[in-house]
């Protein structure tokens, strides 16, 4: 409920009418294509599906949909989208019963950006704890513990698991936000090694691309909600693609400094497809 209220209030703040703000909220909170509910309702494939698990980058409403890209790249497999906007790792852990009920053969996990944002400022962390009813304030330690539990449960259920490193926040790779991203990515690598999962170097490939374009000292992530809401308003109200939104904002790979444009989403899809094919993407 808080996410809906925030998006709606923010859309109003940048000039959208109440009706337009409500429309943006409805679109961004809409169900993902081929989600868990749809799969469990009976559209079950004969083969074990591939399940993509995480938050809004996985859901593909505020971001270009990399899960749909995977469907196009690997058409002989069924893909289930288990992305829920705003989730932290603990919330993903609470959803695992339905995830495991899908009996996935492989699970691609991309979660942690919301955990990072909640650790960047004490007030943000406390706000996340209260609004989400979390048992504790998000932290790197708790994130790593929850992620390890997620992987253990999925592995115990028979799934092969791939853990994506988290994309940059903004484009200034030397700022405090991306130093924190790298700390979380180190935790992801530790969990992958300890739990027998595959590490997918999403951050590393995105950072390399930014550097190759001389864009790795670009606009920094500020923690403001405004770029995200502007992105959603331009996309859902004005019909601009996330690539167009990114270009208008002077950004590369992301329309708002958090979510992914087509190039960014394609990198995630490529890495996941490599994992599914048996190729080893580690070492990028």
Each model region followed by its residue ranges:
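Hydrophobic alpha-helical topogenic segments used for membrane insertion/localization
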Residues: 2-25
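Short, low-complexity, intrinsically disordered N-terminal peptides in bacterial proteins
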Residues: 1-9, 39-40, 282-284
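Short, intrinsically disordered low-complexity segments
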Residues: 1-3, 26-32, 152
């Amino acid at each position: 409920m808080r996410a809906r209220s925030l998006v709606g209030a923010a859309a109003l703040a940048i000039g959208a009418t109440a009706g337009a703000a409500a429309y943006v909220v409805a679109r961004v909170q809409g169900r993902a294509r081929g989600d868990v509910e749809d799969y469990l309702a009976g559209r079950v494939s004969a083969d074990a599906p591939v399940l993509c698990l995480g938050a809004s980058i996985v859901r593909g409403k505020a971001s270009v949909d990399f899960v749909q890209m995977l469907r196009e790249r690997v058409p002989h497999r069924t893909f289930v989208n288990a992305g829920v906007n705003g989730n932290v790792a603990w919330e993903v852990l609470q959803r695992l019963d339905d995830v495991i009920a899908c009996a996935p053969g492989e699970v691609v996990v991309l979660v942690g950006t919301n955990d990072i944002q909640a650790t960047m400022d004490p007030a943000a962390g406390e706000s996340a704890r209260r609004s989400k009813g979390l048992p504790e304030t998000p932290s790197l330690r708790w994130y790593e513990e929850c992620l390890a539990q997620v992987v253990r449960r999925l592995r115990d259920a028979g799934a092969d698991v791939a853990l994506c490193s988290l994309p940059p926040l903004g484009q200034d790779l030397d700022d405090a936000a991306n130093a924190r991203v790298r700390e979380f990515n180190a935790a992801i690598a530790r969990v992958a090694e300890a739990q027998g999962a595959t590490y997918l170097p999403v951050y590393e490939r995105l950072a390399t691309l930014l550097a190759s374009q001389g864009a790795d000292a670009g606009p920094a992530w500020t923690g403001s909600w405004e770029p995200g809401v502007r992105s959603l308003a331009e996309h859902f109200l004005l019909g601009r693609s996330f690539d167009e939104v990114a270009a208008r904002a002077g950004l590369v790979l992301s329309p708002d400094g958090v979510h992914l444009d087509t190039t960014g989403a394609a990198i995630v899809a490529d890495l996941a497809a490599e994992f599914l094919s048996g190729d080893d993407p580690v070492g990028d």
